[in-house]
Amino acid sequence: MIVTTTQHIEGKKIIAYKGVIAGEAILGANLFKDLFAGIRDMVGGRSGTYERELERARTIAFQELEQKARELGANAIVGVDIDYEVLGQSNGMLMVSASGTAVVIE
């Protein structure tokens, strides 16, 4: 399946629009992971823990997006947008949402 942020796919003709679709992932952050990530951030390093969790959430959101497109009979997704949000009173949850338009291409 082709997934792109652009509205068109070069060299391909869109023959049917199946609708707007979305995929989301919400992950809770572990207290100890948060503590060590905060310490690393204070000394100027990158937080590998958060980067891995972010990648995992993004993967889940895109898998859900592709699954919904297939259920509609689409073979591509155009106009993909991805958003990140920190949720919860103590910012203990991460939400990644992806949306786009499911289409059929030749």
Curated annotation (Swiss-Prot):
The record's listing under InterPro entries reads: UPF0145_dom_sf, UPF0145_YbjQ-like
* One Pfam short name: YbjQ_1
**Which SUPFAM superfamilies does this chain map to?**
YbjQ-like
Q: Which family does it belong to?
A: Belongs to the UPF0145 family.
Q: By what name is this protein known? A: UPF0145 protein VVA0283
